[in-house]
Design a protein with these regions (language model features):
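Cofactor-/ligand-binding subdomain signature composed of acidic, glycine-rich
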Residues: 1-32
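Cofactor-pocket helix-loop regions in the catalytic cores of large enzyme subunits
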Residues: 26-29, 33, 38-45
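Cofactor-binding active-site loop characterized by glycine-rich and histidine/acidic residues
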Residues: 40-107
Length: 107
């Protein structure tokens, strides 16, 4: 589901689809952190709230600020960076925190 997901389509997902999406986000975050390092618990704990934000707000027009960035992995996955997520925190890869020059979704 995550591979072809566009951020704006989350608003049209059913409850069951959102549950499947959350499961997939947790799996991808877990697998990536086990390989690349990073913050696991804080990101797993923020999956449902991040999906809820995408189902209500209009990103990237609306902005979200993470207090320390340790909960942004699901946000990165949902905002068009799923294809590059396996490069998390690697040289030349995506950042482990929100970074304005990485995406219009980050502020």
């Amino acid at each position: 589901m995550l591979k072809n997901l566009q951020p704006e389509t989350i608003k049209n997902c059913t409850g069951n689809e959102l549950n499947v999406l959350c499961d997939e986000l947790r799996r991808v975050i877990y697998e990536t952190v086990m390989q690349c390092g990073g913050h696991l618990a804080s990101n797993l704990g923020a999956v449902e709230s991040t999906v809820a934000l995408f189902s209500v707000f209009d990103f990237p027009k609306d902005k979200i600020v993470f207090d320390v960035g340790h909960q942004c992995y699901a946000y990165k996955l949902l905002s068009g960076r799923a294809e590059r997520f396996s490069t998390l925190r690697l040289a030349g890869g995506i950042s482990g925190f929100p970074k304005r020059n990485e995406s219009v979704y980050d502020c």
